[in-house]
Amino acid sequence: MSVLIDEKSHRSSGSTRSRIVVTVVGVLLMVSGLAVMLGHQSGSANEALGMEYEKPSVEVLDLEATEVEQLTKLGLSPKPKLKIVKGGDEQVLHGRFLHITDMHPDKYYKTGADVGSLCHSGKGSAGKYGDAVLGCDSPMVLMEDTLKWVKENLKDKIDFVVWTGDNVRHDNDRRYPRTESNIFDMNQRVSELMYETFKEENPRGGRPRQLKIPLVPSLGNNDVFPHNLFSPGPTLQTRELFKIWHDFVPAAQLHIFNRGAYFFKEIIPNELAVLSINTLYLFQSNPLVDNCDRKKDPGHKLFEWLGYTLKEMRARNMKVWLSGHVPPNEKNYDISCLRKYIVWMHEYRDVIIGGLYGHMNIDHFIPLDSKEAYKSIKNKFGKLGFDYELSFENDLYVSDDDDNSDSDSDDDDEDTSLEESYSNFNSPILKDGFEDSVNFKNMDDIRIQGGVPNGKVGYMENVRKEYYANVKGKKKSGYVSERYSIAHVTASVVPTFNSGLRVWEYNITGLQNLLTSDNQPRFAPWNEFFEGLEKLMETQVEADYDDEFITFGQQVEIFKNDNTFPPKMPKSKSLGPAYIPQAFTPERYVQYYADLANINRGEKEFSYEFEYATDDKVYDMDSLTVDDWISLARRLGKPVKEKKNKSNKKSKKKKKNKDKRLLENSEPLKQDGSKDSRLEQDRVQQSARLENLWQHYLKYSFVSSEYENMGMG
């Protein structure tokens, strides 16, 4: 429990909020400090605090020939494993994990039914395993055989599973209305199937129920009743969810979980964790919550939990993945939630590896711009004293005379705003003031989802225009693109397109030395942290920004004490695995898909097959750091950016001058061709290559279903 520390002193060291924190956990803070300090002292000192420490033994295991063959067949990297033994517990690390999402099993699905009836009745062409693009949910056999394939092919090759929700069918057939009982039952059924898939076949220590590898679920918008609507806890839903997920959620986090269905799971003790975030509290389509700035709303409490948890992870020198169902973007999150989410990722870039999400069924990635987020915060809170120094160009980033061949010129980069992005995604900002808001903001809040996908190519073109083409050059992004963080959205099992699964590979080189170091700090047990955290979360602040008779001075004081805004990352901290290659840095991933059309025709046995890998000749990514993703974003967005710049005479002039400088030392054409024609030829070839890259990206976004060629918008 090394850090229940108030880090808001950079705004108000003597504030009421600070005094409350110290009063609640003052004694815990003293023990916390001792835990860190004594980490490098003698063992007897640690034992005196009840923190016995046993150094694990770590053994490198070479692969057998059959293992190499299996991995190669799956397109995975054959690399040595690590066997960790501590306190009688054994863990084998492969440097891989699985991300699975959006199974949407439908017990009413009938093979041969009419797709117009959502495959529930009539006579038609509904395939045994479901059909891409036709709009039905998953047959039960698709979910069952998917998990059977995972068990047979991946279970013994991965370290953990990230499972990002939507385990219930869509509520889109009035003939078969969903009830709360139905939803609990299906969640229970899917959870039991997941447990059976990943359980330890030979449990140790007489424990009858034991997972072979950790599994981290998160709550989907269709896992609740009614869909999208989720109240602040504790509620019947949070209590039932804890019962359903009792194999996955640590018992010590029961009280925190009951507040809002968020928790975290240690993957490698004191080294790596996955945070499960209830994104329904950030979701614009949840009409039971308003925003993430009002203290009475659950989104505000979620960010309190996130802040305290990340501080503890930093103090323990742990690294984390964030996971959740709904990805952070302008279509999904309330602006007050999105900007906070982005700046927390930015200020904990020494800790956070990345974010893993589902919900959208489209395989793509989203660059999150910290400068845009901070500008948006200033727009709202500047009058209350928000004066965060945006020193990106002068502090984190490269100098004007730095020349980097991977960068587009920053000269044509215009600063954009988060507010503009909401407008461009046709996602209006319905509330971002301090006044009271009304629930059920528009009918989109209760819209029915699922069905035939329409307009998804248009969405991806907007992603290209608003995200990729607006990525800044190196001078404004940083040596390793520190300005940005990345949200990864993976393909779903439900056949919105073809079914998809993703296996990530990450760096475990050097982990052996890290785990066996004599300088490993000792920490108090996690249950002490949770006890202190519960007390902090129970602390209520009466005044809120939108209280009826609130004064401006009181609003200023509330903002000073608002700990849902992160402190700046300490300059003493180094960038983490997301930015600099080290232990836990993502190296590559392999995407698998089920070719449903050929499987349903009987031309293939049911199986998932290799679709692509990030290091293949299409993407050609050496690793998966943020800088690698930003480089890919620049390539994907460059044609759009150049088209935009051509309409700017000043930009064209700068481009011409740059071309002249590039040609000063080039050799003349051997025949009668001019330098201008040579440049034009190069541009045409590059444009063709980039367009080919975009077409491949669209193909993979829609999971090789040919959706991008179907004319569905």
UniProtKB/Swiss-Prot annotation:
Residues 640-659 have a biased composition (Basic residues). InterPro entries: ASMase/PPN1_MPP, Calcineurin-like_PHP_ApaH, EndopolyPtase_N1, Metallo-depent_PP-like. Residues 399-430, 640-684 are annotated as: Disordered. It comes from the Eukaryota. GO terms for molecular function: endopolyphosphatase activity; exopolyphosphatase activity; phosphoric diester hydrolase activity. GO terms for cellular component: cytosol; fungal-type vacuole membrane; nucleus. Keywords: Glycoprotein, Hydrolase, Membrane, Signal-anchor, Transmembrane, Transmembrane helix, Vacuole. It catalyses: [phosphate](n+1) + n H2O = (n+1) phosphate + n H(+). Residues 41-713 are vacuolar. Glycans are attached at residues 507, 645. Its EC number is 3.6.1.10. Residues 1-19 are cytoplasmic. SUPFAM superfamilies: Metallo-dependent phosphatases (SSF56300). It is found in: Vacuole membrane. It holds the Pfam family Metallophos. Processing by proteases in the vacuole may be required for activation. Gene3D superfamilies: 3.60.21.10. Residues 399-418 have a biased composition (Acidic residues). The chain crosses the membrane at residues 20-40. Belongs to the endopolyphosphatase PPN1 family. Catalyzes the hydrolysis of inorganic polyphosphate (polyP) chains of many hundreds of phosphate residues into shorter lengths. This is Endopolyphosphatase. It comes from Debaryomyces hansenii (strain ATCC 36239 / CBS 767 / BCRC 21394 / JCM 1990 / NBRC 0083 / IGC 2968) (Yeast).
